[in-house]
Curated annotation (Swiss-Prot):
GO molecular function, one term: GTP binding
PANTHER family given in the database record: TUBULIN
Family: Belongs to the tubulin family.
Anything else known: This tubulin does not have a C-terminal tyrosine; however, its C-terminal phenylalanine residue can be cleaved.
Protein name: Tubulin alpha-8 chain
Catalytic reaction(s) noted: GTP + H2O = GDP + phosphate + H(+)
EC number(s) per entry: 3.6.5.-
Functional note: Tubulin is the major constituent of microtubules, a cylinder consisting of laterally associated linear protofilaments composed of alpha- and beta-tubulin heterodimers. Microtubules grow by the addition of GTP-tubulin dimers to the microtubule end, where a stabilizing cap forms. Below the cap, tubulin dimers are in GDP-bound state, owing to GTPase activity of alpha-tubulin.
Domain remark from Swiss-Prot or TrEMBL: The MREC motif may be critical for tubulin autoregulation.
Motif MREC motif: positions: 1-4
Necessary cofactors: Mg(2+)
Amino acid sequence: MRECISVHVGQAGVQIGNACWELFCLEHGIQADGTFGTQASKINDDDSFTTFFSETGNGKHVPRAVMVDLEPTVVDEVRAGTYRQLFHPEQLITGKEDAANNYARGHYTVGKESIDLVLDRIRKLTDACSGLQGFLIFHSFGGGTGSGFTSLLMERLSLDYGKKSKLEFAIYPAPQVSTAVVEPYNSILTTHTTLEHSDCAFMVDNEAIYDICRRNLDIERPTYTNLNRLISQIVSSITASLRFDGALNVDLTEFQTNLVPYPRIHFPLVTYAPIVSAEKAYHEQLSVAEITSSCFEPNSQMVKCDPRHGKYMACCMLYRGDVVPKDVNVAIAAIKTKRTIQFVDWCPTGFKVGINYQPPTVVPGGDLAKVQRAVCMLSNTTAIAEAWARLDHKFDLMYAKRAFVHWYVGEGMEEGEFSEAREDLAALEKDYEEVGTDSFEEENEGEEF
């Protein structure tokens, strides 16, 4: 089997983990104590779900996951929550003191104490796999644990499991809603450190999700639970092809092959449709053509940027539910003709399609309506460079005054790391710019010199 191991780091990672495993359990008919419910045999017609769950001798199903936080409160909620019997106690790892929103604490001082234990637990999980496919790592960019500890973990995973793919689900700090002043520092330091270790990173911008909750789901004041449930639907769509049988299935490595043209350009933009509340869904048709075209609306994106200003390098459409290839082909053909989608000239209109027959499941009492079909679009577009530019600008404003830097240096970091990380991100912005320029323009430039 092609197993995936999920690693949830820091408060954001763990809370998204809660939402995701709650949804996975519902999707596979697994109850809160890990045993199969009555519907399970109907849903799991084969054993694809074992990519995410391992089965114990007495018929319990345990998530192939580790939750790590450098302070105990968030993971304690899991230990006392509804799904406390789902996880093995050793899968929930906590430290004593937190990283205090400080990358250096997560990566150097406090993180160093926990890393070996975490790797040991991960090793136990990998030993139970027959054909490990890779790791899914959930974390935020802004927190100390999410940024610092994740980057340390990624470095070590690269050492121990060199060839295995590592996919990130990263929470990008929201432009408006900030939880810490030093988010830009942490984000840029962690991006720089993990850039060479991550194969593909799906960024989720909190603010974009807030807006979707407000606009599409009519939630006036979205809570983290609302946000996380929406994020879990997206994670579920991306991983559905690993957990269910379908017509066109997509493997983890296949994502990379189709979405990542150059190793550094590995930040696909995620869009999901339909995001509708139950009241609205009742009155809407939501055909394949409709949900496909709403994927190209900036309103459905998980990161605030404008693809109409950028160019697409690759595009991957993951459908689930009541969808047939013919409808998809018609929908995509329509998009190609009427949309102002610009592909880079060196990559003619490449759409990769995956279809999965399992319709999206919704959490009872959640915000999303139960729909017959949904689509998740992963596109690699140069527009996402806007997100980096915003972050870099904030970094520059603070770093020009060397504000807050002493907290990092005090934890054993060198100031040079800041400028090194910032240069790396400047290079990343430049990479995106170059990828978007047309190849024939460059040839003309060469002749002039």
